[in-house]
Design a protein with these regions (language model features):
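Long, amphipathic alpha-helical stalk/connector segments used for oligomerization, subunit docking
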Residues: 1-24
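Basic, alpha-helical terminal appendages of large translation-related enzymes
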Residues: 29-141
Length: 141
């Protein structure tokens, strides 16, 4: 997971350096699709377990998914700032820390510790049902 984040960030930065926004977005798309597959596989595997083992596996799947979502959000922030800032708001994290490239490769536990909190104790804001962080452009209606 960390290697995938590092590769995505490097490819994204190379594309942005060359002003290849379409390529940068493709990097984000590929990274998010792979992250979604990792989440799907990990959550399905956790659901097949029972008791404490199931809880531990699902917790790890969520922790990993948060890390990958945070990395993707940092990458996309300059392109779709409003939606990315809304993600940050619902994670209930200081935007300066959340969007800092200094934290991009930190695990969820490392990131939470850098905020002065204990891993596993940070609370996020509840999402309303069927919530979308990225609103449609007026031309899409």
């Amino acid at each position: 997971m960390v290697e995938a984040a590092q590769q995505a960030a490097l490819a994204f930065e190379q594309a942005m350096y060359k002003f290849e926004t379409h390529r940068a977005l493709a990097v984000c798309d590929d990274y998010l699709r792979a992250a979604n597959k990792r989440w799907s596989d990990a959550s399905k595997a956790a659901n097949k377990l029972e008791g404490n083992e199931a809880n531990a596996a699902m917790t790890q799947a969520l922790v990993d998914a948060f890390t990958e979502l945070r990395v993707a959000t940092v990458l996309m922030h300059g392109i779709v700032p409003a939606g990315c800032e809304l993600i940050c708001k619902y994670f209930d994290v200081d935007p300066v820390a959340f969007f800092s490239w200094d934290n991009i490769f930190a695990s969820t536990d490392e990131f939470v510790e850098s905020l002065g909190e204990k891993p596993g104790e940070h609370r996020v804001k509840p999402l309303p049902p069927r919530f979308d962080f990225f609103s449609k452009h007026e031309s899409q209606y």
